[in-house]
Amino acid sequence: MRVISGAWRGRKLLAPKNDATRPTADRTRETLFSMLASRLGSFEELHVADLFAGSGALGIEALSRGAAHCVFGEQDREAIDALKKNLAALGAAPRADVRAGSVLALGPAPRTFDLLLFDAPYGTGAGSVALDKLNRLGWVGADSLISIESAEKEAVEVAGFAIDAIRKVGKAKLTLLRPA
């Protein structure tokens, strides 16, 4: 697994050795960031939340492309260890905040985020549930862009959000949403 673009392009990322997380494939990540770039233009100075972060590949990709800061939410201990090692190896720790624990247990937002990336376990609906909860806790702003990666046939519906785009990549489905 590697960073696709930006300051850290080509740098390898560690992934946890257990089966508790599912790293986003490079092809899926490349498709997602192409979709995001066409809507956001630049990632410069964005505040990003990478939720169900695993090794942090999505948030690190955003930081590599110029995002100002990323909050990472992850509960698996091995994934958190890999994430922290990745941030340290890239010198990205000062622009990151790692929240250990369930994404569903995150409290009120430290701020609203420009971009929220949800990569929950497939088939659980946890991405939609977490978005609904974090929206009520102030994580989502009026102009936020949200990405939920899910299984190809999994429904992604969240009250108060409109679907901006859907793209299928292999067995994954990428859904972009905005506040309605």
Where are these regions (language model features)?
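Class I S-adenosyl-L-methionine-dependent methyltransferase catalytic core
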Residues: M1-A180
